[in-house]
């Protein structure tokens, strides 16, 4: 995954006069222009916060991070709690809520699920545009009465995931969770929309083996890798076992038992 979307032309756009100052702030932070001829993407600032819009006649709708409404809220309320496969994969059990580093945070969906179940989460998203969407979503979540206690358990870190893990300071995370980009073939509208938008920006993860190696060196208890169900394991040490779902699976690399 490249950190800078070299092949894409990106502008920052205010969706109204009242958002110009904030748009200028994001443009300065990300080193992006406010107007760009023939832009491929527009990072838009408006009443719903920050959103990324692909431009062009066949472009999907905008993508934003929203922990208060929509899919995140539905999963928080009705998603199955600690019985969810991701909860089992990271080792959530009675009296066990591990400290988890999500080193491929993306839009923060999986990290939010784990935080809603009581895990203290650290998140790394190395693609600056996606990191900006995540930062904005966390800030808006902190303003919501019900969501604020959850996002308070989510700390966003900046930088290259591999470098951050190799140079980690302080107590290591008990569990490291990885979901590297892979050539997804799912047909759902949501996956198609997000993958169509993100793939030109982030590509796949050719350095997934180095990501796994850094995670295995840092995690104190286990590493969990989410993969499409029929995808090969990441090159390197083999997982001890896997939890299989309908469209994805979780490869488990245990180091030490998680105990209450």
Swiss-Prot record:
GO molecular function terms listed in the Swiss-Prot or TrEMBL record: rRNA (guanine-N2-)-methyltransferase activity
Compartments in which it is found: Cytoplasm
Residue span of region Disordered: 234-260
InterPro entries, A to Z: 16SrRNA_methylTrfase_J, SAM-dependent_MTases_sf
Reaction equation(s) it catalyzes: guanosine(1516) in 16S rRNA + S-adenosyl-L-methionine = N(2)-methylguanosine(1516) in 16S rRNA + S-adenosyl-L-homocysteine + H(+)
Annotated keywords: Cytoplasm, Methyltransferase, rRNA processing, S-adenosyl-L-methionine, Transferase
Biased composition (Basic and acidic residues): 241-254
Annotated residues for binding of S-adenosyl-L-methionine: 125-126, 179
EC number: 2.1.1.242
Any GO CC annotation of this UniProt entry: cytoplasm
Enzyme class, first EC level, given as a word: transferase
One Pfam family cited in the UniProt record for this chain: SAM_MT
Family designation: Belongs to the methyltransferase superfamily. RsmJ family.
Function, in words: Specifically methylates the guanosine in position 1516 of 16S rRNA.
Protein name: Ribosomal RNA small subunit methyltransferase J
């Amino acid at each position: 995954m490249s950190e800078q979307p070299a092949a894409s032309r990106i502008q920052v756009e205010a969706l109204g006069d009242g958002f110009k100052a904030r748009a200028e702030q994001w443009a300065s932070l990300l080193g992006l222009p406010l107007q760009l001829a023939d832009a491929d993407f527009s990072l838009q600032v408006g009443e719903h916060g920050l959103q990324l819009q692909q431009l062009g006649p066949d472009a999907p709708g905008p993508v934003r991070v929203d922990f208060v409404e929509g899919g995140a809220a539905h999963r928080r309320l009705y998603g199955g709690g600690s019985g969810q496969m991701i909860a089992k994969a990271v080792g959530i059990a009675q009296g066990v809520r591990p400290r988890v580093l999500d080193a491929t945070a993306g839009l923060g969906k999986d990290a939010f699920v784990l935080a809603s179940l009581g895990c203290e989460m650290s998140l790394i998203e190395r693609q600056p545009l996606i990191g900006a969407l995540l930062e904005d979503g966390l800030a808006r979540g902190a303003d919501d009465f019900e969501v604020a206690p959850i996002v308070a358990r989510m700390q966003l870190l900046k930088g290259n995931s591999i470098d951050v893990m190799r140079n980690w300071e302080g107590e290591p995370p008990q569990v490291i969770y990885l979901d590297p980009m892979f050539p997804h073939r799912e047909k759902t509208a949501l996956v198609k929309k997000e993958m169509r938008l993100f793939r030109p920006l982030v590509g796949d993860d050719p350095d997934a083996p180095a990501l796994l190696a850094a995670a295995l060196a840092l995690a104190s208890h286990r590493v969990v890798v989410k993969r499409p169900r029929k995808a090969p394991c990441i090159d390197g040490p083999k997982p001890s076992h896997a939890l299989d779902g309908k469209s994805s699976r979780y490869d488990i690399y245990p180091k030490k038992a998680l105990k209450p």
